[in-house]
């Protein structure tokens, strides 16, 4: 059984974990046509993976499984961050500071939950 405080943190992470899907999907529309099906597709898959892995981990029976899925979600978040940086360096898009801050905030939230599950 998970403590209520941890469930609250997870609910918040799930809510914020889907923050960027609409924003990233919108950014991908500005990619050159040939990149929409390469880098753009990779962006979309990574973005969908974040809340999906949070939800799947929440449904697991053990703390270690739960932490593993949250770790996968955090890895996908870093993947999105890296891909957005690349798209920005290639001048495909301009990534807002708000989006960058949201990624950092969610990463910290996930790290905190993972740490609590593992201790």
What do the PLM-derived regions correspond to, one by one?
Residues 1-119:
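Amphipathic alpha-helical assembly/interaction segments
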């Amino acid at each position: 059984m998970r403590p209520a405080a941890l469930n609250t943190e997870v609910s918040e992470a799930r809510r914020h974990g889907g923050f960027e899907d609409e924003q990233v999907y919108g950014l991908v529309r500005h990619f050159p046509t040939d990149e929409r099906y390469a880098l753009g597709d990779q962006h979309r898959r990574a973005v969908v993976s974040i809340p999906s892995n949070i939800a799947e981990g929440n449904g697991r029976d053990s703390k270690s499984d739960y932490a593993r899925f949250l770790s996968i979600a955090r890895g996908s978040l870093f993947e999105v961050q890296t891909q957005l940086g690349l798209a920005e360096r290639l001048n495909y898009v301009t990534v807002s500071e708000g989006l960058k801050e949201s990624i950092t905030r969610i990463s910290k939230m996930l790290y905190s939950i993972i740490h609590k599950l593992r201790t």
